[in-house]
Amino acid sequence: MTRSTTPPMRAKHSSAKRSPSRSAAKVNPVSVKPNKPLLSKALHPRNAHLQGYDFATLIIAMPALAAFVRPNPYGNPSIDFADPKAVKSLNAALLLSEYHINGWDIPEGYLCPPVPGRVDYLHYIADLLAVKGKVVKGASIRGLDIGTGANGIYPLLGIQTYGWQFVASDIDPVSIDNVAKIAQQNEKITAHLQLRLQPQPEHIFKNIIAADERFDVTLCNPPFHSSLAEASEGSLRKVKNLAKNQQQKHGQQSRKLAVSQAKPTLNFGGQKAELWCQGGEQQFLANMIKQSRDYANQVLWFTSLVSKSDNLKPCYQLLKQLNAVEVKTIEMTQGNKATRILAWSFLTPAIHQQWATLRP
């Protein structure tokens, strides 16, 4: 089998300079108005949130959000992102107003994901699956979300944005039940989504992918931390960063208030499987890559978010050992946060072309 590995690249949507050893691309930076900072410095060009949040529209869609909206230092409406109730209300309003998702909610203590960053992943996946440069929409695309969580954010956004079909898996029955409740309130989502409980946490694809199934792509946002203590430290660090930003904008007193009022276990919370696992992100990725080899002919692209760039090198080494045919790293930036998508395939370019022609 011929192996053609693409080293790390930065995704973009204009011309890309290529060299024999590296494919690089950049998302064009968004211009920033001096008196109105954007939500992100480099969201995907198709991201609906490039210009930040339209709170007037969001409040019309969900009036309850108004209770959490206050002017930010620039005089524009915003919320306290250290307040878990405010963040959840914002998410529900965004999903209803922009993506027409009714009844989104999560149980207390479960992970509340930022919508702009999550939908960015899907936009880059759409580019990865594009045929002759054209994004494929509709039910011919089948995605598998590994560890969908109680929020079910990837299948919900993928269905509403691109019309894809999804299977969403999780080891937590509460998460599966909660996503089912959301789906029941949305006819299109019900028709495009299957939920599957993983009975064996050590397995990622086994028990989920049936022998006769094919998926165009798998998605995953793996647990980052290796222990509960490490996860708690990470949550506290996020709170301190928020407080530091508050201090820069409002002074020392505001920082003290932010730290004293913040509750990291809530806003930056999540259940065990959402936040940590033995060996952390690196071990989870290694397990996923090893197990993906058994489903090499049933999945066109395996993908995962990788939060820590240091975890990429061992992934590349393992994929080389397992004879992956193609490997891509798509870098993303949301505000000051950099992350990346690792994508790999065991199928040759010829099979990739054939796969596209066999889609219904």
From Swiss-Prot:
InterPro entries to which the protein is assigned, alphabetical: METTL16/RlmF, rRNA_lsu_MeTfrase_F, SAM-dependent_MTases_sf
Classification via CDD domains: AdoMet_MTases
Record's subcellular location: Cytoplasm
Comp. bias intervals (Basic residues): 10-20
Region Disordered: start-end pairs: 1-38
EC number: 2.1.1.181
Keywords: Cytoplasm, Methyltransferase, rRNA processing, S-adenosyl-L-methionine, Transferase
Domain of life: Bacteria
Keyword Ubl conjugation: no
Gene Ontology cellular component terms for the protein in this record: cytoplasm
Keyword DNA damage: no
GO biological process: one example: rRNA base methylation
Pfam families reported in the protein's UniProt record: Methyltransf_10
Alphabetized GO MF terms: 23S rRNA (adenine(1618)-N(6))-methyltransferase activity
Catalysed reactions listed for this entry: adenosine(1618) in 23S rRNA + S-adenosyl-L-methionine = N(6)-methyladenosine(1618) in 23S rRNA + S-adenosyl-L-homocysteine + H(+)
Similarity comment text for this entry: Belongs to the methyltransferase superfamily. METTL16/RlmF family.
Stated role: Specifically methylates the adenine in position 1618 of 23S rRNA.
Protein name, UniProt field: Ribosomal RNA large subunit methyltransferase F
Gene from which this protein is expressed: rlmF
